[in-house]
Every structure is written in C-alpha cells, then in structure tokens.
Amino acid sequence: MTRRMHLLCVLAAVFVAPIGVSAAGEMPANVGPVLWQRSMNVFRRFDVAPEKMYEFYGGVLGLKQLDTFNVGNGTGVARFQAGDTQFKLTKRVGDRKYQPGGVRSATGLRLVTFMFPDEAALTARFKAHGLPAPQFHAIEGTEREYALVDDPDGQPVELMIVPEKSDKALNVVEIGLTVSDLEKSRAFYRDFVGLEELGPIEDPVFGGMKYSFLHGSTIVSLRSFGAKLPADTGSGGIQYVVSDVDRVAALAQRQHVTVEQPLSTLGGFQLRTIWLNDPDGITNYFAETAQARRSRAP
C-alpha cells in the first residue's frame, strides 16, 4: 500500500467525538489530552469587501454560513460550517505581516482544502456567480481530482472531488502551512500540540514531500520551499477548542512557545483564550469554552 493510500485509509476511519482529558492535577506531555473538539477550526483574514468573501465561501463553495460573532472593537467574525470544522473570516489586523501570492510565495497558512462530492454541481455554482470554471486535474494513484482557485482576497483554495461521497470523507478539511524548517514545525505540531503525525507523502500538486498531522476530521499539512521565504503571520491561523486553557499556557511556558496574546477572557462569551505562535509565527489559538470547561475530569 502506498503512503498516499495509507493516508486515505486513515481519513476514512475518522469519527467525530470529544477527546477525554487527563486527570486533574496531572501535567500532560502535550496539549493533546485537553483538546476537546474533535476537529480544528481555521480562520482567514482579508482586505476586500466582506460581501465578496461571503459570496465566494457561501454561495460559490456552498459552505453553510452561521451567525457572525461581534467580538468587540467593531470586529466581526463570520463563520461557515465545513464538515466538523468552522471556517472563520475576519478583517485584517494591523500588527501582523501579510504577503501576496500562493503556497510557494511565503511561509504561513497558505492553503485551505475543502472536499466536494460533485464536480458538475460545483462548477455550475462558479459559472452562476460569474467566475471561470475551475480546472480539475487527476491525482495519480487515486480516483480524486483537484483544482486550485483564489478567493476574492487572492488567497489560494484547493477544491478536492472525492469519489467516496461518504460523510467521513467529505467532512475532512486540510489546512496547508508553508514552513521554513520542517523539523521544527513537525516537532511543534507533534510534540507540543499533540496531533497525530501521519508520515510524509510525495506531494502531487506542489512537489516535494508533505508532512500531515490529523486531529479528528481536520488535517494540518506542512510544506517547505526553503528557509528564505518572507513570513506571512497574519493571513490565517488555527483554532483549537480545549477543556483547560491554563494547562495550555503552562505547557507553552515550559516548552518556550512564543505567546502572541496572553491568557484572557472574552466578555459575553464565557471564553478564555491564549494565542500562541508556531516556529514561523503562524497563529495557534486555543479557546476554552464553557461547554468544554464542564467536561473536565473531576
């Protein structure tokens, strides 16, 4: 069995359920035991009219739009459902770096992959919204096809047609990170965050090796095109829902992880958060919700 087919088999076995936490008072080796939501969420920041982004991700891609959160200071977070993952959109902030271009142009969160059952229906929605039809290409050794398009802000999106047409296959969302040092990034997502490393595969789209990490129905994939790319630290990031954000903060201190925003409480939402950076400055945002907090072991 090829590594690619092994990855597909692993994804087919994905199920959705909260993960248990370690006993009270124990310090876990990584964040894994306090990851509560059996998926990750992903956010993108943009600099175009919000309506254009909402039309693309909702009307064209067909993601279900949820309520928009107003988190204060005039900041709205638009939310879309993609399988078990929430895909979030918000305007750019001023204290981060942004780089134009695609997956090879900068380090950062450079690609989001969504799964679709029907190429014809997806293509029809592109045409109905006045957009060129995506150009699909076969992935050698599989029955899948992919197309690369840009959203209205110029950020790349991969459209994957999956022949399985099962909920498990269609619920998968893949977050593509371009990194400067694969070993440092692998260590962060494996040894600090506690994601399951699936092993490298040859990347049929961008070339080289791709290192993937699984949490429930969400994949984080790492690619590297050298150490000298400019850093994009603002265009996107990953959110994890956890049962104990204090433990995340303690682990971050112990492992010398960069803190982007310290522990804080978001008024009106019963939400406690800490924002951390991976080795390339990509935001990893840990949120303790009231529901997750109640799940802690006694």
Describe the role of every protein-language-model region:
Residues 6, 20-25:
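Short, low-complexity disordered leader/linker segments with a strong preference
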Residues 9-18:
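Bacterial N-terminal signal peptides
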Residues 23-35, 37-48, 77-81, 98-171, 176-177, 200, ...:
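Vicinal oxygen chelate
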Residues 28-29, 64-103, 149-152, 156-163, ...:
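Conserved short beta-strand elements that form part of the metal-binding/catalytic scaffold
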Residues 34-36, 43-87, 144, 176-219:
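Core segments of cupin and vicinal oxygen chelate
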